[in-house]
Amino acid sequence: MTPPILRRLDDLRALRRDWMKKGDTLGLVPTMGALHAGHLSLVEAAKAACDHVVVTIFVNPKQFNSPEDLANYPRTEHEDAQKLAPYGVDAIYVPDPDQIYPEGYATTVSLTGVTDVMEGPNRPGHFEGVATVVAKLFLQSGADRAFFGEKDYQQLMVVRRMARDLDIPIEVIGCPTVREASGLAMSSRNMRLSAAATKTAGQLNPLMEAAATRLRAGEDYAPLEAEMRAQLSDLGFAEIEYIDLRCAQDLTSLDRLDRPARMFVAAWLDGVRLIDNIAV
C-alpha cells in the first residue's frame, strides 16, 4: 500500500501527537527523493528500531551551489512512493516550500570545525543549507531517531554536531554505505552517468580499498595519495577535488594510520561530481 503523502506541517504534527499519546517511537529518514537501495536500507533500519517511520522528501535549494545542479536534480515523487510501498512506511512528508521556508524566513544554522574541510570549502554554503533544513525537519517531526547513510560521512557528523549543540533530543544513527556490485556507492547522481562512465566510476572503490590495505600495512599516506591521483586521472576523472585521510571522530587530517580513520574522495567524471569514503 502506498504511504500517505503529507504536504503540510499541521498534518505531520497531528500524526505525531497520536503516536506520542501511545508512547510510540518515530524514526525519520530525511531524503531529497530519487530513492535507491541505499535510501531503502535506511528505511529498513528505521523500521527495525522504531514503532513508526516517516520518510521526508524535500529538494532543498539552500544546499545546492549551482542552479544547474538544482534544476537537474531528479524529482521522482510518484516512483519514490511506489518504492516505499512494500516497506510499511507510515507517511511520506513532502513539505510545500512554504512549510520549510515561509515568507520572511531569515534563520540559518551554521557550524564551524567539522564543516571547514573537504565538502565545506568545495561547496560554500552547502552545510548551512543541510544543517538548517535538517534542524527544521527534526523539530517539525519530533522524531526519536533519524537515519543517515555513511556515504555522506561528513554530513552525518555535521548533523550529529548540530543536534548535540542545539539540544535537539534525537538520536542520529549512521548506516553503512550501500554499493553497486562494482563497489560504486549508490547515489541519486549516478543516473546521470553514461554507461561507460558508470563502468569507470566502479573502479573508484577498489582503488580506495587497495590504498587502505597498504595504509594498514604501515605505508605513509602522501605517496599513496599521489599514486591515487595519477590513477584516477588516467581513468578519465576530470577534476580530483580531494583525496583525504582523516580521523573518523573529528575529521582532523592524518598522514599515517595511527587511529580509527576514514579515506575520503571527491572527483568529477562525465560532468558528475562523485564522492565516496571508506573506513580504514
Swiss-Prot record:
Active-site residues annotated for this sequence: 39 (proton donor)
Gene3D superfamilies recorded: HUPs, Pantoate-beta-alanine ligase, C-terminal domain
CDD domains: PanC
UniProt xrefs under InterPro entries: Cyt_trans-like, Pantoate_ligase, Pantoate_ligase_C, Rossmann-like_a/b/a_fold
Any single GO BP term: pantothenate biosynthetic process
Main localization category: cytoplasm
Substrates-to-products reaction catalysed: (R)-pantoate + beta-alanine + ATP = (R)-pantothenate + AMP + diphosphate + H(+)
Coiled-coil zones: none
Pathway info: Cofactor biosynthesis; (R)-pantothenate biosynthesis; (R)-pantothenate from (R)-pantoate and beta-alanine: step 1/1
EC code: 6.3.2.1
Group of enzyme by EC: ligase
UniProt keyword annotation of Ligase present: yes
Molecular function GO labels: ATP binding; pantoate-beta-alanine ligase activity
Binding-site list for (R)-pantoate: 63, 155
Keyword Transferase (UniProt): no
Subunit structure: Homodimer.
HAMAP family, alphabetized: PanC
Role this protein plays: Catalyzes the condensation of pantoate with beta-alanine in an ATP-dependent reaction via a pantoyl-adenylate intermediate.
Other remarks in the entry: The reaction proceeds by a bi uni uni bi ping pong mechanism.
Protein name per UniProt: Pantothenate synthetase
